[in-house]
Swiss-Prot record:
Keywords: Ribonucleoprotein, Ribosomal protein. GO terms for cellular component: cytosolic large ribosomal subunit. Belongs to the bacterial ribosomal protein bL12 family. It comes from Streptococcus pyogenes serotype M28 (strain MGAS6180). CDD domains: Ribosomal_L7_L12. The gene is rplL. Forms part of the ribosomal stalk which helps the ribosome interact with GTP-bound translation factors. Is thus essential for accurate translation. One of its GO terms (molecular function) is mRNA binding. This is Large ribosomal subunit protein bL12. Homodimer. Part of the ribosomal stalk of the 50S ribosomal subunit. Forms a multimeric L10(L12)X complex, where L10 forms an elongated spine to which 2 to 4 L12 dimers bind in a sequential fashion. Binds GTP-bound translation factors. GO terms for biological process: translation.
């Protein structure tokens, strides 16, 4: 009998939360934080720590996201950067998104990104 009462109470609480406005929910969160000495910002801090970890990364993959309008120039740049033949470079550009280079140092990755973007490509460093 006690479990049924608790389930009904939980259902009532959920129904009230669904009907509450954003301001009321904000006040509820603040009240819960004060009452129980917790903070709702903890997951945000964990995400920020992950971002700092990524900033310290020392090797990157240079991904060609899109060749853009200047496909021929991008193919030439890919050939110059990778040493691939014309057919292979064209295949890589046509197959975008694709990694142009993997595991390169941050400075080299930025250079490659600049060359490819100058040629008209869209690049992502991962």
């Amino acid at each position: 009998m006690e479990e049924i009462t608790m389930a009904l109470n939980i259902e009532n609480i959920i129904a009230e939360i669904k009907e509450a406005s954003i301001l009321e929910l904000n006040d509820l969160v603040k009240a819960i934080e004060e009452e129980f000495g917790v903070t709702a910002a903890a997951p945000v801090a964990a995400a920020a720590a992950g971002g700092a970890e990524e900033a310290a990364k020392d090797s990157f993959d240079v991904e060609l996201t899109s060749a853009g309008d200047k496909k021929v120039g991008v193919i030439k740049a890919v050939r110059e950067i990778t040493g691939l033949g014309l057919k292979e470079a064209k295949g890589l550009v046509d197959g975008a998104p694709a990694n142009v280079k993997e595991g390169v140092a941050a400075a080299e990755a930025e250079e490659i990104k600049a060359k490819l973007e100058e040629a008209g490509a869209t690049i992502t460093l991962k």
